[in-house]
Swiss-Prot record:
GO cellular component: plasma membrane
Main localization category: membrane
GO MF terms held by the record: undecaprenyl-diphosphatase activity
Family to which this protein belongs: Belongs to the UppP family.
Transmembrane domains' residue ranges: 1-21, 39-59, 83-103, 111-131, 149-169, 189-209, 218-238, 246-266
Name of this protein: Undecaprenyl-diphosphatase
The keyword Transmembrane helix appears for this protein: yes
GO aspect biological process, one term: response to antibiotic
Amino acid sequence: MTYFEAFFLALLQGFTEFLPISSSAHLILPSAILGWPDQGLAFDVAVHVGTLAAVVIYFRKEVVTLLTAWVGSIVKKEHNKESNLAWLIVLATIPAALFGLLFKDFIEIYLRSAWVIAATTIVFGLLLWWVDKNATLAKDEYQMTWKKALFLGIAQAMAMIPGTSRSGITITAALYLGFTREAAARFSFLMSIPIITLAGSYLGLKLAMSDISIHLGLLSTGVIVSFISAYICIHFFLKLISSMGMMPFVIYRILLGSSLLVWLALH
């Protein structure tokens, strides 16, 4: 991997991780079209660290508040809306964690293909359009219930299917449940913290147990570039989502998926 490839892939990961457009659909393009080599396990860990740092630092006030309330609910048995939301985020993490443990190998073998990614990019883009068009957009994240959190957790588990988009499917599910676009995005991003932490830890453990050589310069590039691009992406997405809605992302997903299908048909 060259420094240009590391920069480009980290930039792509950072910008697409939190937008409802599927990071896997974008990360397959350099290898499928340009013939770039697989980015490797070590680089996967690096970009996970970068995107995790971005969402934690961006939501640092909320993270500290929720974490403090969560610990307080355990140690002091003090319960409030913040501790309740924290527990619901934990609940929403469980389906994806279990799904990942049970079906990761199956997904890697049978579903990680350009054809699947192209199809899911289009299908879930259309679902996002339909839900956003018909959503009531009335609730904030503190009106979350355990049933709604579990529903969002199941949606997050579905994001294991390449091309679905973790943020895309969870925002779609939250809009379907009547949450505002801002609340749907915030809860989706907060949900991402434990699941990215788990995924990054799993990859880090695999890396530690392997004999893969590590290039610190390339990994540092991955961490820094993915952090900066993800932070910028989160900031502007939350600023613009209420006014522009989901249609730009729907159109983009359909164009991307269709282009990928055409390219696959011709090759």
